[in-house]
Swiss-Prot record:
Localization per Swiss-Prot or TrEMBL: Cytoplasm; Nucleus
GO molecular function, one term: MAP kinase activity
Documented activity regulation: Activated by tyrosine and threonine phosphorylation.
Protein name: Mitogen-activated protein kinase hog1
Binding site for ATP: V26, G27, M28, G29, A30, F31, G32, L33, V34, K49
Motif TXY boundaries: 171-173
UniProt-listed InterPro entries: Kinase-like_dom_sf, MAP_kinase, MAP_kinase_CS, MAPK_p38-like, MAPK_Sty1/Hog1, Prot_kinase_dom, Protein_kinase_ATP_BS, Ser/Thr_kinase_AS
GO BP annotations, alphabetical order: stress-activated MAPK cascade
The keyword NADP appears for this protein: no
Species of the source: Hypocrea atroviridis (Trichoderma atroviride)
Gene, per the UniProt record: hog1
Post-translational modification: Dually phosphorylated on Thr-171 and Tyr-173, which activates the enzyme.
Residues found modified as Phosphothreonine: T171
Length: 357
């Protein structure tokens, strides 16, 4: 039985195994507190995330289960990886991941990025997205603070808490506004992996310019700012809007022509402008894919088609529509944790049918 030690962080009790020491708070989110710590087994610095009340409601229990399943499935150099998971005596769940020194948001607010760093960071983002999308996963909340970077400029995408299946009827109000694709704002209905490409385009533009490209104050202002640069959406995009109110709003906007991105990004080279043009397209189906972006001239210095892997298999989303009680999610979660630690002789849930028969 592991020995647990307690520490108070921001008024929150961290109850972790004695394997980890030197807890220091590094971030607070809606669903958990993250601390840095020293892994005394590997002598490496790690990030320890405490999930707040993971079994308080069926919705939170499912979210916790989904996050763990994604952690276990997504194994790629440009995606954050799980190094340990445990349940404390108080039944809190802790995820332990590698610790990277900073994130893209902090880098962008501290100094301008040189061209070779912009290229290398964008290459790694696209390399990670190629893999994630091939697994049938949409991140949905890609933004600079979710892109971690270490001192060697290695980049990893993190925080798949909002990630969901590729689903033509996907719904929700999800990513941070500045980086949110127009199809999320306009329809709240149909979107897919292309939303991540839009977000990556906004991040690319921010790396080039040093400030957010579309800093909207609210949804209406956000969309207006986008149309000032990219023009009015084409009719075939407008016709996909499901909400009558949204449709009226879009049709009430003054007609605008798309502005040449060259006018805004005067110091960027032509290949950067061309790639950005292909990422920031209103019609999701005409947006460049991660695989296509990797082969673009702008990323040629780093492109290696033999070292840009895809997922071996699609992520299994069959649990996602299941409406189960907390205790069932908890049993399934415990089973996944034991499986992660290769504990033999535990009841497995692989044969669980969703929804249960």
């Amino acid at each position: 039985m592991a020995e647990f030690v307690r520490a108070q962080i921001f008024g929150t009790t961290f109850e972790i195994t004695s394997r980890y020491s030197d807890l220091q708070p590094v971030g607070m989110g809606a669903f958990g507190l993250v601390c840095s710590a020293r892994d005394q087994l590997t002598n490496q610095n790690v990030a320890v995330k405490k999930l707040m009340k993971p079994f308080s409601t069926p919705v939170l229990a499912k979210r916790t289960y989904r996050e763990l399943k994604l952690f276990k499935h997504l194994r790629h150099e440009n995606v954050i990886s799980l190094s340990d998971i445990f349940i404390s005596p108080l039944e809190d769940i802790y995820f332990v991941t590698e610790l990277l020194g900073t994130d893209l948001h902090r880098l962008l607010t501290s100094r301008p990025l040189e061209k070779q760093f912009i290229q290398y960071f964008l290459y790694q983002i696209m390399r990670g997205l190629k893999y994630v999308h091939s697994a049938g996963v949409v991140h949905r909340d890609l933004k600079p603070s979710n892109i971690l970077v270490n001192e060697n400029c290695d980049l990893k995408i993190c925080d798949f808490g909002l990630a969901r299946i590729q689903d033509p009827q996907m719904t929700a109000y999800v990513s941070t506004r500045y980086y949110r694709a127009p199809e999320i704002m306009l329809t709240w209905q149909k979107y897919d992996v292309e939303v991540d490409i839009w977000s990556a385009g906004c991040i690319f533009a921010e790396m080039l310019e040093g400030k957010p490209l579309f800093p909207g104050k609210d949804h209406v202002n956000q969309f207006s700012i986008i149309t000032e640069l990219l023009g009015t959406p084409p009719d075939d995009v407008i016709n996909t809007i499901a909400s009558e109110n949204t449709l009226r709003f879009v049709k009430s906007l003054p007609k605008r022509e798309r502005q040449p991105l060259r006018n805004k990004f005067k110091n960027a080279d032509d290949s950067a402008i061309d790639l950005l043009e292909r990422m920031l397209v209103f019609d999701p189906k005409k947006r460049i894919t991660a695989t296509e972006a990797l082969a673009h001239d702008y990323l040629a210095p780093y492109h290696d088609p033999t070292d840009e892997p895809v997922a071996e298999e699609k992520f299994d989303w069959s649990f996602n529509d299941a409406d189960l009680p907390v205790d069932t999610w908890k049993i399934m979660m415990y089973s996944e944790i034991l499986d992660y630690h290769n504990v033999e002789g535990v009841p497995q849930m692989e044969d669980q049918q969703f929804p249960p028969q």
